């Protein structure tokens, strides 16, 4: 029984990692900032001048603090790693814990259509895939599992960039319909692991350094776009390491919105017990 359950858990692959990583479980306050991300995408000489002259350290610190206050948001982007090229989207609610994420990439045995769709509501994780005939979804009970208690990924990237020795203001661009200052720099894993400053929380520092190590990356170029209201509009990270090229870029929206994340219909979802019982029957 334990061996079967272990194989069932392993079969989640990218989907399980997506849901756990994309919802970092940071300490956002309920309600968030409904006005976040409302800056105009039209060029404004006064606003653009202020964004172009913004100090990286000060603006990144402000953006990270504002980001940590957000309880809900959407992210949409692209990712390239050793598993292939993906388009990604995720709706995240920090408290109560919920997320709805989808990866679309290469077709595999676990994802024959190339789609990995994971919904997490509390201690229940729902994954797309017909593990039991006639059921479009199957579920895992995460009760008792140790979740991440670090900040949300976009806050981690922003504070990681703030630790970079070469961080700079690269100019003003339009992202997601809003004008934003583009900050860029190189984060070296060994330097980050030894960082003792106050730009990044110790837990976030350790988690991000671990993430880089798992991706086989010793250094990455990070980009963070921040609008005039101090809201993070986009993050990007790129590098080349032992596993090849890595690139990820995400845009953020709907801060503070009611995302209406819900579990799939019970009639279409196989329970963990049903999945295990079906796997046992197949092995007889």
What are these regions (language model features)?
Residues 12-16:
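Hydrophobic helical h-region of N-terminal Sec-dependent signal peptides
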Residues 19-22:
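C-terminal motif of bacterial Sec signal peptides marking the signal peptidase cleavage site
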């Amino acid at each position: 029984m334990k061996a079967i359950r272990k194989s069932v858990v392993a079969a989640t692959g990218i989907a399980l990692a997506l849901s756990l990583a994309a919802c970092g479980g940071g300490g956002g306050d309920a309600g968030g900032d409904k006005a976040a991300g409302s800056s105009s995408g039209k060029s404004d000489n006064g606003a653009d001048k202020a964004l172009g002259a913004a100090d990286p350290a000060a603006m990144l610190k402000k953006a990270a603090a504002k980001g940590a206050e957000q309880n809900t948001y959407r992210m949409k982007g692209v990712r390239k790693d050793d598993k292939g090229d993906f388009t990604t989207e995720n709706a995240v609610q920090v408290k109560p814990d919920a997320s709805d994420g989808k990866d679309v990439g290469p077709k595999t045995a676990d994802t024959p259509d190339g789609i990995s769709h994971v919904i997490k509501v509390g201690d229940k994780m729902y994954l797309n895939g017909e593990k039991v005939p006639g059921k479009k979804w199957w579920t895992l009970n995460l009760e008792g599992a140790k979740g991440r208690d670090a900040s949300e990924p976009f806050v981690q990237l922003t504070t990681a960039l703030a630790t970079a020795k070469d961080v700079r203001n690269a100019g003003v661009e339009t992202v997601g319909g809003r004008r934003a200052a583009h900050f860029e720099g190189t984060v070296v894993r060994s330097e980050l692991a030894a960082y003792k400053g106050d730009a990044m929380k110790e837990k976030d520092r350790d988690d991000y350094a671990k993430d880089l190590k798992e991706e086989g990356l010793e250094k990455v170029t990070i980009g963070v776009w921040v609008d005039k209201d101090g809201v993070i509009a986009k993050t990007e990270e790129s590098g080349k390491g032992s596993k090849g090229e890595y690139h990820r870029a995400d845009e953020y929206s709907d801060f503070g919105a009611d995302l209406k994340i819900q579990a799939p219909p019970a009639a279409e979802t196989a329970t963990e017990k049903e999945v295990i019982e079906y796997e046992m029957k197949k092995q007889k």
